[in-house]
Regions:
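N-terminal amphipathic/basic leader segments beginning at the initiator methionine
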Residues: 1-23
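Short cytosolic juxtamembrane segments of multi-pass membrane proteins
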Residues: 305-306
Length: 306
């Protein structure tokens, strides 16, 4: 596990370097919102989404930084905007994230809202640089022939009402219900958590030149990873170590929130994590070289203790 962590740290530093290339300059009358955007982006983290994107891109034969790097930056900006909005008083009202004060605590709720809006819009502006790079890619055999246009479509769809935003909506709606069934909970996990992992890996595949069947298989693998990741999160809320997690356990129970564990029990939840993990890794193993870093990374993500 130490080998995967050292490799992940190195890859995360590479992704951070890419992100820094696209930070907006903190100037002009809009300087304050840009400061808040950059504060949020530079809060640290393992940069899992851009790391996954680049790794899939590399394994499937992608070689051009001008094509992939704008999308790496864009996916992290969208992920960060979602965290900024999640932390707001109207949502989770969190004061700390990744060991430092959240954006709304430092800049106020209004400016934090604008910072999230700014990150979402700037993400698409940055991604367009990949579209305008001038690099010629082979036609895609899906609904859209142009690969960068397809990547932009995936980015928008997985982040929006048919992806992350839709999952967040269902999650908020579920908070007010006494009973949430398994189908609704899986919908939340597939969209709120898995959709952006799907986006990361699918975009890497599309831009590398993968055919439609391969892209769809990558999507299915990423969905299984995302759901397993969230079930593991529910498990850790019951049996995790508070010091390792850096937050109190049993918070879902105290908030009377329906989780995978409350619906299916602890042992069944563990079995489903193992099953989903194996299914995802079996799919990814068809990609040459995936056992060197990609599959160990997925295994670490799902079997983590914090």
């Amino acid at each position: 596990m130490s080998d995967i962590m050292s490799t992940l740290t190195a890859r995360a530093e590479e992704a951070e370097g890419v992100l820094k290339k696209y930070l907006p300059a903190e100037t002009g009358y809009q300087k304050k919102v840009i400061e808040a955007m950059n504060y949020s982006l530079m809060a640290g983290g393992k940069r899992i989404r851009p790391v996954l994107m680049r790794e899939v891109y590399r394994l499937l034969g992608g070689k051009d930084a001008a094509v992939i790097e704008p999308f790496m930056a864009a996916i992290e900006m969208i992920h960060t905007y979602s965290l900024v909005h999640d932390d707001l008083p109207a949502m989770d009202n969190d004061e700390y994230r990744r060991g430092r004060k959240t954006t709304h605590i430092v800049y106020g709720a209004g400016m934090a809202t604008l910072a999230g809006d700014g990150l979402l819009n700037y993400a698409y502006e940055v991604a367009m640089k990949g579209f305008l790079s001038g690099v010629k890619l082979p036609p895609y055999d899906g609904e859209i022939a142009d690969r960068t246009a397809m990547a932009l479509t995936i980015l928008a769809e997985k982040a929006g009402i048919y992806g992350m935003v839709g999952g967040q909506c269902a999650d908020i709606e579920a908070e007010g219900k006494k009973e949430v069934d398994s189908a609704e909970l899986i919908f939340i996990h597939e969209n709120k958590t898995a959709a952006m992992l799907e986006s990361s890996m699918m975009i890497g595949a599309v831009l590398a030149g993968a055919d439609k069947a391969q892209v769809l298989e990558v999507e299915q693998a990423a969905r299984k990873i995302g759901v397993a990741f969230q079930i593991q999160d529910d498990i850790l809320d019951v049996i995790g170590d508070e010091k390792e997690l850096g937050k109190p356990i049993l918070s879902d129970e105290k908030n009377e929130k329906t989780t995978y564990v409350t619906l299916h029990g602890l042992e069944e939840s563990k079995k489903d994590v193992e099953r989903l993990s194996k299914e995802a890794e079996d799919m990814l193993s068809k990609i040459d070289g995936s056992r060197e870093f990609l599959i160990p990374l997925v295994d670490w993500m799902i079997s983590r203790n914090k």
